[in-house]
């Protein structure tokens, strides 16, 4: 097995691993949704909110893994074409040196940077490249949009046949509009003030 064939194998393996991670996130999301229902049934809105945030975070992370899996898979196909056509250049050989460790790390930002280098090299070989959306760094934040959390809480409450509107702060039960954003900002300010008072 040549060096490039070995790297090609590793790319395909990494794509499968990323896909596996996406499925794991999907499973975790379902688990968190079940916990939301239980918490709502017990009247623990704050606990339900935490599980809703976790569910949305798992969903976003799963999407990120799927996107990166597709991107790595696309690069693997390009490597396969380049190997088949004998168009592997010296500059390409330089890019693959750090590949194995990067792919094994399952670090989305590092893999994304590696894919950037590969895609740049293939552009110079006149192989068409299709960029995915902006790299994962902006979407892997720890914060979750509150309107998504609130929507998920209501969805789980509806599925459980419960009324959650009495327990949520006013202004977050209807359609999400500009007033919700200001209400959320006010809530954040109040929570921050309470934290300061406790210190």
Curated annotation (Swiss-Prot):
GO BP of this protein: endosome transport via multivesicular body sorting pathway; late endosome to vacuole transport; protein transport
Sequence motif MIT-interacting motif, location on chain: 186-196
InterPro entries: Snf7_fam
Membrane topology term: Peripheral membrane protein
Domain of life: Eukaryota
Localization: Cytoplasm, Cytosol; Endosome; Late endosome membrane
Keyword Coiled coil: yes
GO cellular component: a single term: late endosome membrane
Pfam families linked: Snf7 (PF03357)
Composition bias, Polar residues: 170-183
Main localization of the protein described in the UniProt heading: cytoplasm
Coiled-coil segments: 8-42, 178-199
Annotated keywords: Coiled coil, Cytoplasm, Endosome, Membrane, Protein transport, Transport
Complex and partners: Probable peripherally associated component of the endosomal sorting required for transport complex III (ESCRT-III).
Protein function: Probable peripherally associated component of the endosomal sorting required for transport complex III (ESCRT-III) which is involved in multivesicular bodies (MVBs) formation and sorting of endosomal cargo proteins into MVBs. MVBs contain intraluminal vesicles (ILVs) that are generated by invagination and scission from the limiting membrane of the endosome and mostly are delivered to lysosomes enabling degradation of membrane proteins, such as stimulated growth factor receptors, lysosomal enzymes and lipids.
Protein name as annotated: Charged multivesicular body protein 1b
Species of the source: Xenopus laevis
